[in-house]
């Protein structure tokens, strides 16, 4: 499989190219973990490219006008798709990576989607590895990539659950037999591996669990940064709760806001920092008004320096319906934060004693009681604990380098 490229330690005329397949390159969990890894790569040896998904449109006057004025951007590497610039676009391009575009998969466009994938891989023969993080359609694009001559195809499970309804059912359907369609199967946790690849694949040892590693040093607790961040937000003396995540069903924001409202009944100095963006943001802003907490909730959007906001927080909240292995929970622990987390989240994410698991079947008041009980504590440097638990991206990057160059995944 790896015979077409130079082995580790050999001279290479140019970098091998690894294609990561994702929904997009916004500030999401999988995207952020891949970017953490990308920054650690020697790009003279290994270069990352990205294949993302966007809505296919007819190029009428209005569409071309939006492209011309920069409010929407047609990627010249796309196929009839128009996409808005996303969070990581500039950094990827600055590091020498390319962003390619496929039409979003909608089930009804199954045949046109397959056609677009075939056309893409027929035109691009430069990839030595295709790593599919978008497992909902990996059963389609990985076999096509393999038949097109890509030496190695990888399916990487990044989540442990699907949304409700027909969309979730479709995801389950198209994931069937995925373990047999990839040369390597990776999962961010046992839970994610079981959900995506199935119990049999996990028990057979076919799936390798690779934790979502972070740049631990960037998040290490710093009292000076904490004071500066709180002063800038005007919350110097407040009890600061926080959450980082997309505004979407999975993250369970309605419940989170109800928990915060219950905290506010007991602590008049409490505030909530919400980092992230998404389609449900407007609805959550309205819910804040309904709960009477709008003036105490800070909708901060996507932030390049999210690590500063972790320093400002006192308690981190993650009441998700499901997760793979949430990188934000690892980041929060790296910042020395106490974390209140849904018991649906894998225990593999607990790298320190700072994590408390609670059921989202409990009343919001029960969560509020636990938050207030644990609110007074001394922050500490947890970097060594995170490193020893396998969450340091610098160490993980060495294993990935070996894998990309030789096919040996044992060191990841």
Describe the function of each predicted region.
Residues 14-112, 206, 279, 403:
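N-terminal strand-loop element at the rim of the active site
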Residues 31-36, 239, 243-262, 279-286:
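A conserved mid-protein helix/loop that constitutes part of the nucleotide-sugar donor-binding site
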Residues 117, 220-235:
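A short helix/loop element that forms part of the nucleotide-sugar donor recognition site in Leloir-type
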Residues 132-138, 157:
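Short His-centered aromatic/hydrophobic patch
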Residues 182-220:
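A short, active-site helix/loop in glycosyltransferases that binds the activated sugar's phosphate group
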Residues 285-301:
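Nucleotide-activated donor-binding/catalytic signature segment of Leloir-type glycosyltransferases, i.e.
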Residues 302, 321:
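Aromatic "clamp/platform" in nucleotide-sugar-dependent glycosyltransferases that forms part
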């Amino acid at each position: 499989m790896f015979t077409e490229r130079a082995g580790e330690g050999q001279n290479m005329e140019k970098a091998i190219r690894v294609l990561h397949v994702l929904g997009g390159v916004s500030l999401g969990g999988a995207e952020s973990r891949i970017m953490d890894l990308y920054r650690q790569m020697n790009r003279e040896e290994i270069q990352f490219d990205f294949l993302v998904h966007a809505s296919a449109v007819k190029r009428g006057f209005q569409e071309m006008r939006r492209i011309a004025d920069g409010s929407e951007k047609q990627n010249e590497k796309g196929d009839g798709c128009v996409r808005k610039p996303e969070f990581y676009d500039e950094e990827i391009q600055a590091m020498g990576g390319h962003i390619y575009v496929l039409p979003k998969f909608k089930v009804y466009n199954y045949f046109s989607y397959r056609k677009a994938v075939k056309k893409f891989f027929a035109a691009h023969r430069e990839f030595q590895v295709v790593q599919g993080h978008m497992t909902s359609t990996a059963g389609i694009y990985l076999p096509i990539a393999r038949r097109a001559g890509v030496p190695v195809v990888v399916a990487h499970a990044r989540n442990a659950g699907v949304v409700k309804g027909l969309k979730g059912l479709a995801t389950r359907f198209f994931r069937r037999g995925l373990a047999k369609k990839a040369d390597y199967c990776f999962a961010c946790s046992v839970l994610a591996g079981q959900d995506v690849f199935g119990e049999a694949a996990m028990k057979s040892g076919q799936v390798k669990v690779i934790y979502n590693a972070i740049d631990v040093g960037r998040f290490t607790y710093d009292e000076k940064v904490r004071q500066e961040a709180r002063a800038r937000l005007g919350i110097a003396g407040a009890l600061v709760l926080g959450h980082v995540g997309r505004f979407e069903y999975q993250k369970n924001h309605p419940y989170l806001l109800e928990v915060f409202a219950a905290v506010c009944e007991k602590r008049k100095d409490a505030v909530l920092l919400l980092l992230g963006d998404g389609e449900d943001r407007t609805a959550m802003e309205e819910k804040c008004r309904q709960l009477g907490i709008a003036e105490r909730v800070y909708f901060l959007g996507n932030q390049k320096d999210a690590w500063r906001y972790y320093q400002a927080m006192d308690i981190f909240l993650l009441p998700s319906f499901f997760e793979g292995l949430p990188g934000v929970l690892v980041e929060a622990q790296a910042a020395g934060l106490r974390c209140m987390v849904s018991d649906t989240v894998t225990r593999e994410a607990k790298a320190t004693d700072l994590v408390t698991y609670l059921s989202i079947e409990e009343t919001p008041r029960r969560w509020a009681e636990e938050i207030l009980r644990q609110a007074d504590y001394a922050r500490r440097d947890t970097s060594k604990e995170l490193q020893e638990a396998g969450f340091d991206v610098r160490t993980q990057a060495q294993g990935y380098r070996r894998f990309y160059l030789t096919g040996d995944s044992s060191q990841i």
